[in-house]
Amino acid sequence: MISKINFVKMHGLGNDFVVVNKRDLSSSYDLSQLAKNMADRHTGIGCDQFIIYEEHDDFYEMIIYNIDGSSAKLCGNATRCLAKLIYLDTGKKDITVMVGNKKLLCNVEDENNISVNVGKVSFNEVWMPSRDKIWELAERYMIDLKETICVDIGNPHLVIFSKLEPQDQKIVGEKLQAKELFADGVNVNFAEVKDNKIYLSVWERGAGLTLACGSGACGSFAAGLKLGFIHSPSTVVFKYGSLTMKEENGNIIMQGAATLVARGEYYCEQ
């Protein structure tokens, strides 16, 4: 039997998503498999992550799947996209999004300026692998471990303040997913600082290198503040645009654009 699913295609600075309202999904769907199918760029719609949302009385719940069908704990760009979608559909400007137990406060200033308060981050050494385990990688790719830091922003990020070529970013990103290094994988941020701006590339666990990463921007901004490389406010620059970052009372706030690409129907065999 073939069923129809309404979807929205959106992107934040090139980081793209297929977004579906939970009310349009049958309870019989295997959501992990559906995510893999719809995310496929050859046989599906194509995206970096698959987003399901549900409206509640005073917040919207967001569930995130990676292209490999695994779940993700946070996505800053997807949050901005969802906030814009809700604004376009309802006119609401102040929107609360829940991802798991993480509350994200969003404000739509206009269609091209959406801010998300992601709250406080922690610099969590608990899941940092022992230095000797990554010494070989650091030595081979000239990574300064004194300028490498773990940030937990609701999902785990390893921020490396060293310039690596794209082909080396791919290799290092893949190698750091090894279970003996990070049991659940890790998002790897390659950050370069110039004139109080962070130029960022991110290897996302479950997705690989993406054109932009909102949570990576937040984590890298927080890491840059802690290490004294930048001050607030700052800008995080990606290939297709930038995010404005600031810190207020310990909370990290990002602001940037989100783009609606298309609305359509996906036909699913059950």
Swiss-Prot record:
It is an enzyme of class 5 (isomerase). Substrate binds at residues 15, 49, 66, 76-77, 155, 187, 204-205, 214-215. Its main location: cytoplasm. Its EC number is 5.1.1.7. It comes from the Bacteria. It catalyses: (2S,6S)-2,6-diaminopimelate = meso-2,6-diaminopimelate. Signal peptide: none annotated. It is found in: Cytoplasm. The keyword Lipid biosynthesis does not apply. The active site is at 75 (proton donor), 213 (proton acceptor). Pathway: Amino-acid biosynthesis; L-lysine biosynthesis via DAP pathway; DL-2,6-diaminopimelate from LL-2,6-diaminopimelate: step 1/1. GO terms for molecular function: diaminopimelate epimerase activity. Homodimer. This is Diaminopimelate epimerase. It comes from Rickettsia felis (strain ATCC VR-1525 / URRWXCal2) (Rickettsia azadi).
